[in-house]
Amino acid sequence: MAAKPVLYYFNGRGKMESIRWLLAAAGVEFEEVFLETREQYEKLLQSGILMFQQVPMVEIDGMKLVQTRAILNYIAGKYNLYGKDLKERALIDMYVGGTDDLMGFLLSFPFLSAEDKVKQCAFVVEKATSRYFPAYEKVLKDHGQDFLVGNRLSWADIHLLEAILMVEEKKSDALSGFPLLQAFKKRISSIPTIKKFLAPGSKRKPISDDKYVETVRRVLRMYYDVKPH
C-alpha cells in the first residue's frame, strides 16, 4: 500500500489549502506536519529538502515536491482531475488561473491591519462580482454541462468552489446575481468526497486567526508590514 502524502506547512490555509482541497476531493487521505517553531523550519532548510527554501512541500510517490502549482498539477493529473486531453487541460489551466488570481487577493488578508482589511474586503468582493463570477457564469451557460470542462469533475471545479466559499466568507450573498454559480456551488458541494471535506472535523482549515499570523511571522521572521493589493 502506497504511503499517504505528507504535507509540510503551517496549521492554517495559506498556499497549502488548495492542495488539501484537491487531495480531499480525490478521496486521498494525507498526513500533515505543521511548522510551529523557527528551529523546526531551520532544520528543514538545513536538510536540503526544500528546493527553494520555502513551503508548501509535499512528500508524495517518493518525491519531495515544492512550488504550489507543480504540486497541484501532479495531484490533478494523478487522480484524473486534469481533463481527458490537451485541450481540456488548457481550459482547466485557464479557469484555475482566474480563480488563483481571485484567491490571491485574499492570501495576504490575515496579515493586514484592521483598516486595510476593510478596504481589501470591499476590493475582493468588487473584483469577484464584476470580473470573475460573471466570467464563470458565462462558462457554465455556454458549456451547458454540470462541470466547467468536459462532463466530469476537474480541478477547475474544485478550485472555483474553494474561491466561491472564500468570497462568501467576506460577503454571504456574493452569488446573489449568479444563478448558475449558485446551482454549481450546491452541485459540487454535494459530491461525497467534497461534502466530507466541508463537514466539521475534516482537515479543512478555518479562517486564519491571529494565532496563525503570529506563528507564520515567527517561523518565517516576517517583521515587515503587509499591504493590500
Curated annotation (Swiss-Prot):
CDD domains: GST_C_Alpha (cd03208), GST_N_Alpha (cd03077)
SUPFAM superfamilies assigned: GST C-terminal domain-like, Thioredoxin-like
Catalytic reaction equation(s): RX + glutathione = an S-substituted glutathione + a halide anion + H(+)
A Gene Ontology cellular-component term: cytoplasm
Residue numbers binding glutathione: Y9, Q54, V55, Q67, T68
GO MF term (any one): glutathione transferase activity
Blocked amino end (Ala) modified-residue sites: A2
One of the Pfam families matching this protein, by short name: GST_N
Keyword Secreted: no
Domain GST C-terminal: 85-207
Statement: the UniProt record of this protein carries the keyword ATP-binding: no
Signal peptide (residue range): none
Role played: Catalyzes the conjugation of GSH to a wide variety of electrophilic alkylating agents. Also involved in the metabolism of lipid hydroperoxides, prostaglandins and leukotriene A4 and in binding of non-substrate hydrophobic ligands such as bile acids, a number of drugs and thyroid hormones. This GST does not exhibit peroxidase activity.
Other comments on record: The variations were found from AA sequencing and imply there are multiple forms of CL-3.
Name of the protein this chain belongs to: Glutathione S-transferase 3
Taxonomic source organism: Gallus gallus
